[in-house]
Amino acid sequence: MYRIAADLHTHTLVSNHAFNTITEMARAAKEMGYCALAVTDHGPAMPDSPHIWYFYNVRRLPDVLEGIPVLKGAEANVMDVNGTLDLPSEVLNGLDWVIASIHTDCLPGTLTVEQATDLWLKVAENPAVDMIGHSEQAKHVYDYERVTKVFAEHHKVVELNGNSWAVRPEGAGNMKALALACKKAGCPVALNSDAHSIYQMQAGVGHLVRLLEEIDFPEELVVNSSPRRLLEELKLHNKPVVERIGGT
């Protein structure tokens, strides 16, 4: 049985279309028995997102809130087919957890498979990126088998996003093909809620668990399935946050 020991993709009301404070999100994660929570508000190119100053100042928050370690991160926006992100490296390198995602407000239109494949291959080379966010989207289908091999080589975690069934249903069907490619490539994945409120935490997790069970996905490749696996993954990313998370 797959379980989630930490959520690596959540938002707070700093992203104005979300609803809860970081303290409230941390408290809810603690009550769910999580070992850690990543708070990853949208990069500044996204409408309703925080100013770039936020991503400097978030590092000054306590490392532990409401009794749970908090990874202070960002969901950076991919801005073009060259894989350019909307936050500079000096900001990204100071964060605990960085997601790279495509949002249509920042990269409108539909990409060809070739364009999307090239885009993600370039993102894979960015050492500041830790995880690839909701990349199953219908408008940006890429060569999953080719790219997940490169993701694995560069220690990129591929997100399986529980919120996609609600907000990106047209692409949710691609999740199985993406997961199968990760299984074949030995590429790590994370099961996340992409919650924008405490009421969405664990959103879609049941769908994700059933999907992994259906394809007999190796539990050891699910990086947030236990504190130990999360700790091991963070060490691969050279994150100082490992000192705040116990690995059992």
Regions found by a protein language model. Give the residues of each.
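Hydrophobic "anchor" residues on beta-strands that sit immediately upstream
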Residues: 3-5, 36-37, 71, 130, ...
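Histidine-centered catalytic micro-motifs
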Residues: 5-15, 39-42, 132-136, 193-195
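N-terminal pre-domain/capping segments
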Residues: 8, 12-27, 56-57
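Histidine/acidic-residue-rich catalytic or RNA/ligand-binding cores of hydrolases
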Residues: 16-20, 48-52, 141-150, 168-183, ...
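Short acidic/histidine-rich active-site segments
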Residues: 42, 187-202
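Extended substrate/RNA-proximal surfaces in nucleic-acid metabolism proteins
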Residues: 43, 48-160, 213-222, 230-248
